[in-house]
Amino acid sequence: MKNSFVRIAAIVTTAIFALAGCGKKTETAPAKPAASYPLPEPPLVADCEPGIPGGRLVAALYGEPKTFNPITGNEQSSEEIYRHLFAALLGFDCPSEQVSPGLAESWTNSPDGKTWTFKLRKNLRWSDGEPLTADDVLFTWNDIVYNPDIDNVMRDGLTVDGKKFTVTKVDDLTIQIVTPGVYAPFLETVGALVPIMPKHVLAKAVADKTFISAYGINWDPKNIVGSGPFRIKEYKPAQYILLERNPYFCEVDKKGQRLPYFDNVIYTVVPDFNAMSLRFLSGESEVDDFIFPYEYDHFKAESAKGKFTLLEPGIGLETGCFWFNENTNVNPKTGQSYVDPKKLKWFRNAKFRQACSYAIDREAIIKSIYSGRAIPNYGYVTPGDKKWFNPNIRQYPHDLAKARALLKEIGIEDRNGDGTLEDADGNKIEFALNTNVGNSAREKVAVLIKSDLEKLGFKVIFQPIDFNTLVQKIDATYDYECLLLGLGGSGTDPSLHINVIRSDGFTHNWFPRQKHPSTDWEARLDYLMNAQNKTLDFNERKKDFDEVQEILSEQVPMIFTVTPFFYAAVQSDMGNVRATPLSAYRATWNIEELYFKK
């Protein structure tokens, strides 16, 4: 079952290397054979080559997880771990973009397209051995996902015209979900994206209103219960996270061998992506999902020696982008505006943002940082998404003259000949640009963006900061002016992006959680995203989402930079590797199927 819910610490010490050195030579006590635990009826059968059980996979993790909770988590260092711990009603095959059975063995849909019925497998178990039933599905939806006291990125997209779905239990193995109207991406989102959570573990946290801290990094690992292929055995902050096979996992291969094949997966925490690459190249880890284009030549040369296989899945869904803080609200704690009013006036002007986009020399970024292995990107959807990409959006090739002309139209020009632009009130155009430390490519892109904008006449203060602090600025404090991050990797269906595009979205980053759209174009985005959600006609959905892309490229609330080619690497003796550019986890999206051939 492939889950799609699927965003800084010191380098581990020699003592930890003794624990995490070679994945195939484990000194941990062997796990109880998976066959000794009862299987669900019927078990899920993986469509893969039967492999060899055993061994330990070693990988590196950039940054510390903030949580092991898939409902409240919203960044990659956490997702890297919790994606292994939980399962959904359905699975999702990334290369083919097809849903498949999961915890549910079957499902049906009514003729009007609004009533969905899921039949769970008999004798499903949580990772602690407790039964998994329809009560857990009901609890997940009614007590967690739709709980107004629990902030989560999923809820934004799980409505029709603002109305929630009705989720009811038919019997212990049957759940019925009724949508207020046709909901086009039902199977991809409801079925494959919503992780089912254990009522027997988390009901008290929901009742006590402490769910936000449930499954936190301070929880005892044995109490973090899920139904995915692995469970947490041990967590040492700033050092490693040791996962062990979930003996109750519901999937087997064609020979009847229970998945996953690996006994353990260990993630050693590293401070940056360079350290991640060094660990792989030195043989201290056995998989690297995040190889950057500028590393390609070195990895290609090393792979020729036969120690590992370099994977080249192609252009993916991820892109770099930066945006300005357009939040018009007042901080209730201070009584002050989140954004300096004079700067807010600049940031909320589309011509200001268009000028910034014209100022960026994307070809220089591609050549100097990505070694030519990237393409310019001007829109929300990358060319890697062949199904939904709109090639007719407005583009912004590097043109400082156009940028200056646009700024002059809104009263921004060099008024005193000092080389710095001022607005109509004489305020110098100056702001801080943040990105996360540890991603050297992104930091280099930020330096080039700063340089390009300064050539335009802005003063830009570049301040890289810790990733978790950056997330807090985006999600909670809104204490920033301009941010550069990556975007993408969450799937291709338009409805998976409602939380970003719709104005009330949890991750509508430039101005999140609006009670009412703050602009006419955001209101139009809301309408279009709701409209495409309510029809099963692909052509109608494509038309609506094409317009969404056109609005975003015209209004540029996010200024996109480049989309890199994707690369990954695995040790040469790893089986069932099916690399894809359509997942952030290019080589390990199907980790339960991976195994060592010898």
Where do the language-model regions lie?
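Active-site-proximal polar cores
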Residues: 561
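Long beta-strand-rich cores associated with HINT superfamily self-processing modules
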Residues: 570-598
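Sec-dependent N-terminal signal peptides
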Residues: 8-14
